[in-house]
Amino acid sequence: MSLGGGGGGGAMEQIQQQLQALEQEKQAIQAEIENVRDEQSEIDEAIEAIETLETGATVQVPLGGDAYVRATIEDMDEVVVTLGGGYAAERDSEGAVESLERKKETLDDRIEELEGEIETVEEETASLEEKAQQAQQQQMQQLQQMQQEDE
């Protein structure tokens, strides 16, 4: 008789492990969404800078390691924009903004994709929670049957 109860407990334990794995997956996806949103914010800042800075303006240029140097913009007519894959291209201000806007659109698509993944994980979670509830009800019924048999 204890085999039936133990099997149910094992099923519950397996379901709990699957639920934990799904929760971790959901958290990882949410973290990736935050990273993508941060990247979008950086793009917005770059677009704003391109649109507002003028030749002769003084800016702080990051050197890395939280070190900056003051620099004077000599020419806002040409902006270097990364294209991906380690490549960059020189564009006029308008072309640079267009390039950055396309990057943002790609990131929007990625966010939609990730939100779809979260939806799938949530559906799987709901399904597992339903299975857990059913397994728990089965365990309760088995326990009640064992108690009735003992009486």
Swiss-Prot record:
SUPFAM superfamilies: Prefoldin. Keywords: Chaperone, Cytoplasm. It is found in: Cytoplasm. GO terms for molecular function: unfolded protein binding. Residues 133-151 have a biased composition (Low complexity). It comes from the Archaea. One of its GO terms (cellular component) is cytoplasm. Pfam families: Prefoldin. GO terms for biological process: protein folding. Its main location: cytoplasm. Belongs to the prefoldin subunit alpha family. Heterohexamer of two alpha and four beta subunits. Molecular chaperone capable of stabilizing a range of proteins. Seems to fulfill an ATP-independent, HSP70-like function in archaeal de novo protein folding. This is Prefoldin subunit alpha. It comes from Natronomonas pharaonis (strain ATCC 35678 / DSM 2160 / CIP 103997 / JCM 8858 / NBRC 14720 / NCIMB 2260 / Gabara) (Halobacterium pharaonis).
